[in-house]
Amino acid sequence: MSAQGFYRRSLPDSAIAFSSVEGRQIFREALALGEMEGYFALAEQFHTQAEPAFCGLGSLVVVLNALSIDPGRIWKGVWRWYGEEFLDCCLPLSVIKENGITFDEFVCIARCNGAVVKPNRYNQSSLENFRQAVEQVTAAPGDIHLVVSYSRKVLGQTGDGHFSPIGGYHRQRDLVLVLDVARFKYPPHWVPLPLLWKALKPVDPVTNQCRGYILLQKSERLPETFFHVAFNLHQWRSVAPYFAEILPDILRKEQPDSIASFVSTILHNWPVEFTTMLHTSSETAETLEKLRAAIELNSLFDIVHECLSSDHGDAMCVVGKWRSQQPFVAETITAILLSGPETLYATLKPDLRLWLSEVRYLEKLISPLDIEISRLREQMSALQDFYTLYSKGHQCNIHQS
């Protein structure tokens, strides 16, 4: 009696298996042409996606580890390393396991995890631009990679929406190497670049947008950090209105006439959701003293600390309870005010906005505070941008490996 299910699929005629005689010959020729330089960093990290709908996460794990991005969290034992289970910053893993992720969700997750991302949808690019991007990443020694979001149907494969990294290019034959992370289904394979380009065109039936390709690099400002945004998109939905509407409306009504008055107003209306917004990495606790010293040298910290130490501190119900349960609350509040979206300050008087703009200016923040705030801003910006898309009606897509 045969077992239930399927054991792999045969590649269509349009694809050439990487391990076949012809596939190996193409590899040797591409290597000699200098078009496999990005392959080796990816090959070191190449793995099979952990779930049938994890093609996006699987591709991203390969690339994040290939770029040597430190997740700042323990994977197993004493090791910091990316696994799919870490990539829940925009959506819960349970949702991704059911539905997969869309192009925009991939971008959000990549940005939240420290990658510099350049997304390119089919209708915003061209065949020649795509070819140039492929040439760029395959000739680079592993500091930039490209992931394609494409329709398998166009390639003559089963299933539909899929993500995979590009591992190489043969310019003379115009073939690209697709490192298919669904290795239980298809092996890595060479396909004609123009055909892969056509596979980016089909419209995602949920987002009503074309698919595309994403360039990913490691941020130059990304050593290990102490603070991380602890929310995924669903949790961020409860926080975003405070930055964009609720607190700005309160500030508009109160019209504080000084920074101290502004901080006091914020602290008296501090949302309980803000108390769990930031996660701290115990693995990097040795950097805490340097970070605290840098925060305490920031003039905004002085005002936050003074407001918390005032006789009115007990009136700040949420913050007062928070202070009794956790150390470094003044430092955490300062970090949130330095890194939060600028919409929070939109209704303040011009002179107060100017003061905050100067104190938040990244180039004036001393190390390691500048790196921490840069990372937090990128994470918050990624979530805020994706929240905006989500609020317009975009939903999770179903990706079938």
Task: Say what each PLM segment does.
Residues 200-375:
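Low-complexity, Gly/Ser/Thr/Pro-rich intrinsically disordered linker/tail segments
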Residues 61-63, 172, 184, 220-222:
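Short loop/turn segments at secondary-structure transitions that flank enzyme active sites
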Residues 1-39, 348, 366, 370-380, ...:
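Non-catalytic, low-structured ubiquitin/UBL-interacting segments
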Residues 83-163, 167-211, 312-313, 318-353, ...:
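Conserved active-site-adjacent core of cysteine acyl-enzyme catalytic domains
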Residues 4-92, 239-303:
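Active-site nucleophile-adjacent alpha helix/oxyanion-hole segment immediately C-terminal to the catalytic cysteine
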